[in-house]
């Protein structure tokens, strides 16, 4: 039997990278009526326009048996593509991989495309669906997420930034999502918390539910974090596409030349 060629190996790795988490995580995702990161990017961008970066990156943590689970991509899909023929940079957290938590390589990957967007003066679109910091990676993860926040702050006022919150987002992910110019929360699944909702006493004892404390209506009417509420995921993508991209490109160019 002939040995597999290097191109066959590459195809196998690419197929593995395109597999979102394990089967149980994927079933849980489907049960909630949510889509995978790649499906969301496919819906957001023009067909066939997505160019992915760092699809084979893996975390390097060894504690807490993390060496036994090293999925390709480390729970985030990132790259650039087109919306109505205009170039944008985008990323999407994959809740089916480590619950979308942000580890060292996950954060570095997002930081890389954010820096590319700033240097290229392109809009940055983030699809957020993650449980914040990946505690298993400890201070290594903290350092990388700190660098990411620095880059996002540097992007503020330089390029248009969009955050689509399509799941329960907590901790550093919520903080990062809130730095955008346009924050769009999905009415069904979009929630934002500065700490895990499962650690909040009022939620634990049933005094309030997650939506009342961190849901889309709460952030649109009281906290002011949300600019718009989307009826569902497709509506969130449509809203993003309808925002005048030509205007945002013009403003980015003017900011660069000033």
Q: What is each of the regions a protein language model found here?
A:
Residues 74-78, 87, 122-123, 149-150, ...:
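Short glycine-rich loop/turn motifs
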Residues 128-243:
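Conserved catalytic cores of soluble enzyme domains
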Residues 248-257:
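Conserved small/polar residues in nucleotide/adenosyl-binding loops
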